[in-house]
From Swiss-Prot:
The active site is at 25 (schiff-base intermediate with substrate), 58 (proton donor). It comes from Thermosipho melanesiensis (strain DSM 12029 / CIP 104789 / BI429). One of its GO terms (cellular component) is cytosol. One of its GO terms (biological process) is pantothenate biosynthetic process. It is found in: Cytoplasm. Binds 1 pyruvoyl group covalently per subunit. Gene3D superfamilies: 2.40.40.20. This is Aspartate 1-decarboxylase. Substrate binds at residues 57, 73-75.
Length: 119
């Protein structure tokens, strides 16, 4: 039986900007997308640690090395610049094929300080 399980997580990233008039999405530095195994345009759940808001959107790539996390569209009303967020992507797995998620632990400057596999 297939189950929906956590595939990837970017933990405690800092929102660097927001744009209410953009057509939706969350922009993420392409380097972070690659390291986290989250694809451009993939569906993600975002949790704002500062205010408890959660929303579903999709990713778009930001410039590699920019460390940008940009919330766009209506969801931009749910965050503030400087908020810390958890970005989660899920996948469908058979129990015997699931090895656990890849988790990027971020610092205040949106630098990866640790990568955890299968935890």
């Amino acid at each position: 039986m297939q189950e929906i399980l956590l595939k990837s997580k970017i933990h405690m990233a800092k929102v660097t900007d927001k744009s209410i008039n953009y057509m939706g999405s969350i922009g993420i530095d392409v380097e972070l997308l690659e390291k986290s195994n989250i694809k451009p345009y993939e569906l993600v759940l975002v949790a704002d640690v500062n205010n408890g808001q959660r929303f579903v959107t999709y990713t778009i790539p930001e410039e590699k090395g920019s460390r940008k996390i940009v919330v766009n569209g209506a969801a931009a009303r749910l965050v503030e610049q400087g908020d810390r967020v958890i970005i989660m992507a899920f996948g469908m797995y058979e129990n015997d094929e699931y090895k656990g998620p890849r988790v990027l632990i971020m610092n205040e400057d949106n630098e990866v300080v640790e990568i955890r596999e299968g935890t």
